[in-house]
Amino acid sequence: MLDDRAKLLLKTLVERYIAEGQPVGSRTLSRAPGLDLSPATIRNVMSDLEGLGLITSPHTSAGRIPTARGYRLFVDTMLTAQREHMNAPSHLPPDQPQKVIANAANLLSNLSQFVGVVMTPRRASVFKQIEFLRLSDRRLLVIIVSPDGDVQNRVIFPEADYTQSQLVEASNYINAHYAGLTIEQVRDRLQSEVEKLRGEIAALMQAAVKVSSEVLTEAQEDDVVISGERNLLSVTDFSSDMGQLRRAFELFEQKAQLMRLLDVSSKAEGVRIFIGGESQVVPIEELSIVSANYEVDGQVVGTLGVIGPTRMPYERMIQIVDITSRLVSNALSHRK
C-alpha cells in the first residue's frame, strides 16, 4: 500500500506526463503546487515507486514516466470526478443503425482526437417481425426485422407456389405466435408443433427459420466501424516510432482482434479501461482503450470506445465515451 505522500507524488507525475509528454524529474515535481517536498525526498519516493513497478526511467533520462501498472493505479484510485466542458451534441438524430454507428464513431474521434471504434449492433437471434412478399412463381422475398430495427432481406425459392394472401396469413401467424423468441426457441417449438400447423404455414416457418439463422450468423465485414486512425499521426508517442504506428494500423486493418477486445469489454457495466496489454487480446503496450456498452430499449447490443496512447487524458476520455454511449442508446431506442 502506498502512503498519502507517495500517492500524491504518483498522481502529480502521471498528470504532468500526460499533459506534457516528457519524463518528469524530481526538480519539476518539487515545483508542483501542493507537493511540498524537497527534491531529495522526492527522489527517494520515486525510487520506491520505481521499485514497485509504477514508474520507470526511459533510456538515460533523469526523469520518470508511468508504467502500465502506474497508469492502472492512477485510473483506479486517483481520477477526479471533475466534469469538463466539451462540444458534444445534445443528441444523435434517430436513423438507421448503420448511420447512427457511423456518426458515433466520428463523434468519438472528433472529441477525443484519437481513434473512435463502434461495434455494430449485434444481430440478436430474435426476430421482431417477418414478412413474405411474392415476387413471382416460387420466388419469395423474406423480410426480417430485428429488435433494434435493422431490416434484412433474402430471396427464397420454395417448392410450392403461394398466393400473397397465403403469405400474409402465414406472416401474421408467425408474428403473433413466435415474435420475440430466439431462433433456437422457434426451431424447438416448430419441431413439436409442425404436425398441428397447416402445410403452407409449416413450410414457410421452416424457410423463415433457415433464412433467419443464415442472416444472424453470417460474418459481416463492417462489424466494427473505425474513425480517426490518422489522428495517431499527430500523437508524438506514435509519430516518433514507426514500429508502434505500424502495429496500431495493423490492428485497425484486421479488426478481428478489435472485435474480441470489444466483446471482452461488453461483459462489464459502465466505462471500462484497458491499459497497454492488460486485455491479453490486443497485446500492444502503447495503446489504451476506454469503452462502454450501448443499449436498445435497455438491452446491451454493442460496445464503443476510444483507442489512443497510454498517455491519454483518462478523465476526459471516460466522459466522451460515457456521453457517446448514452447518445447512441437514445438514438437507437427512439427510432420511428
Curated annotation (Swiss-Prot):
Pfam families: HrcA, HrcA_DNA-bdg
Cited PANTHER family: HEAT-INDUCIBLE TRANSCRIPTION REPRESSOR HRCA
Function text: Negative regulator of class I heat shock genes (grpE-dnaK-dnaJ and groELS operons). Prevents heat-shock induction of these operons.
Organism expressing this protein natively: Variovorax paradoxus (strain S110)
HAMAP family noted in UniProt: HrcA
Protein name: Heat-inducible transcription repressor HrcA
GO molecular function: DNA binding
Family: Belongs to the HrcA family.
GO biological process: negative regulation of DNA-templated transcription
SUPFAM superfamilies xref list: GAF domain-like (SSF55781), Winged helix' DNA-binding domain (SSF46785)
Transmembrane segments: none
Record's keyword terms, sorted: Repressor, Stress response, Transcription, Transcription regulation
